[in-house]
Amino acid sequence: MVLNYIWIAFFVIAFIFALIGLMMGDTTIFQKIVDSTFDSSKNAFEISLGLTGVLALWLGIMKIGEKAGVVNVLARALSPVFTRLFPDIPKNHPVMGSIFMNIASNMLGLDNAATPTGLKAMQQMQELNTKKDTATNPMIMFLVLNTSGLTIIPTTILAFRASYGAAQPTDVFIPILMATLVATLAGIIITSLWQRINILQPVLLATLLGMCAFVGIIIWGFGQMDKDTMNTVTTLASNMILLGIILCFILAGFWKKVNVYDAFIEGAKEGFTTAVKIIPYLVAILVGIGVFRASGAMDNMVIQGISWSVEQCGLNADFVGALPTAIMKPLSGSGARGMMLEAMKNYGPDSFVGRLSCIFQGSTDTTFYILAVYFGSVSIRNTRHAVACGLLADLAGVIAAIAIAYIFFG
């Protein structure tokens, strides 16, 4: 329901700003908006088309893991934690393994593996859903974990900083890790409070503290490396783990006497079906965002409004130059990336704004895109509190990113 109102607002606000632009002499504003609808529709289809091969690959691998029993082993191992965080999911259900695979892939920055395993988890949770058009509590918790974007290896951002000539491309690594950890913890806490989950249970509390300790160790470890070593280690570790997972599933299938090839084909067929199913949802959300951006509402209403408010309060407004990246990130990953690159180009990669833009880019994920793809894959229309919890987690990540940037670079 919330997503419905947001989508309508994109078009209404865009039309109002287009009328204002026309009265100020911009006779091409309506053409820009209409062109954006065609471009966004084409982009949505191309994204879905690009996902088809990746979905087929990873859902095929996951099907091998299911038939070999690997997913069930993961589910049993994670049951003590996940049965408390997802209390509506039966103990030792295979979806626990899929959720773990998705979270692990996100943490390693393996987007190509994260989306297919996430969609598989959604399909498994939908099988438990008694109201097929309404999001369940476990679905919402799972999506908030995705939108908060906990990533421990922001390889792409570091590569962009290096290409723009940053003196120390890796100097944003620790701030990104800290900001994304805050966003993830905030997402878990907010959603748990909404769903009345007791996060003070010893097992959950120990897990959250363990997660903080793990991130702390990662921060310390990478802090001992120079930038070249760090880039080499992150790339090598990511790809070794990815290939190791594939090999593990295949060998497990062979050991259990599963027809590995047939199992892969069976799962890959599901990937094609899923890719087709999400096209309407992607078109809807990307066209809405495209119209909103093309009308100028993003710059004139949001960015300038925040800048004016901050200045009126007498606060330091240095961070405002990086806000386009933060505001665009929940709406569009490619749009936010473009804003980050533009900030580094205009202000410099080693400027406060340039660094903060990179932290924004790495601290959260594309909330509306994730909601559209994941809910669309199982035809969920009533998203309940998913949007609110996801955006609150994003807000926590943005506030943390600003505070951390002032501590490190202010």
What are these language model-derived features?
Residues 1-53, 159-292, 311-313, 385-410:
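Signature of multi-pass transmembrane helix bundles
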Residues 30-127, 256-346:
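Membrane-embedded alpha-helical segments and adjacent helix-loop junctions characteristic
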